[in-house]
Amino acid sequence: MEIYADQKYTKLVSHLYYQNSHEIVHSSKIYQLALTNPDILSQYINYPDESNESHESHDCHESQNSTHYKFRLMEIYHKMIIIDNNMDLLDLLFEIMSDDFRCDDCVILDLAIRHQRTDVFNKYIILGFDLNRLINSSTILDEIILWYHQIKKYDTGIELCDYLIDNGASISIHNYCTIINAFDTLNDKYVSFFLNKISLNDLGNLLFWYLRNYYNVNIDIVETILSNGIDINNFHEYSYMLIGKFNVPIMNLFIRYGLIIHDDVIDDACRYGNHLLVDYLMEIGHKPSKQIITNVIENHNVNIIKLFVKYNIDLSDIKPPTSPEIIQLVKSLESNGLSVDYVYGYILDKFNLSGKLCI
């Protein structure tokens, strides 16, 4: 690339370099283009810090470390694309290292999202840009959903999402967080749009992913997915791994939609130390296997042991392995007058105080 050689211009570039000494500015495409064209330097690089767009972004996206420098790019591109509509200059920018995705591209795509610029998206699509890659640590679809939910313009958000999906953005595991965010808005238009875009198989995968990865599961989102006809007893090949971890409201919901509770569900709940679910399952008639009862007692899971007592679980055949030395010691203590009740109580109390309540 040939750099414009005028001495006065070179001095301006040098001044800009040291005045804005930061990697994001120096490595930006607009800076590289400015080195070849003095008009770009005067019109865009030195554009004053007045763009309202930068203040919008300050509230929504930026981290403290790089805020000023990305604002600078936002101001420059806001003037170029939104105010001047200089698409010819944007074409020149795309010619600079077009295979290298940079901070500039994040800023430009962010502007395209906020100002409904499908013409800008189309330029990226022509260049072969992957619409499923991350910008600002999330997907383009996610940015659209969150932005248009924030400003309550759902129809516009849906139009943009539809355009991008038609041009290669996929609803896959890479965008599951996007769909959950859409469902989490509880906006009927967003929810209906994405439900119509997802196959039953992908919907089952989405449900599995959500239940496995989210700590605070929104039961309304779960019901939204369940109500769309997925096979609740076979929605994912590993769904059985999750059921024993359900909380009681989620289990109630699944049962209401036809979940068949197999014998191993209560065993899994015991294994995970999920005593609230174990209590619920015992109350409706399920009982753990002898092997799990033995494991619970061996590991002194006091909360589950209490439930065995509460529901009169027969423990007469349960004999956890104990070394002959320990058996002899207990018998000796008993023969010396120490109550066996005291021994059991002491051991359980010690495990309780040390927090060993789970298998």
UniProtKB/Swiss-Prot annotation:
Extent of the ANK repeats: 72-103, 105-133, 142-173, 203-234, 236-260, 261-287, 288-317
Superkingdom, taxonomy of origin: Viruses
Keyword list, A-Z: ANK repeat, Repeat
Matches recorded under InterPro entries: Ankyrin_rpt-contain_sf
Gene3D superfamilies, alphabetized: Ankyrin repeat-containing domain (1.25.40.20)
Protein known as: Putative ankyrin repeat protein R190
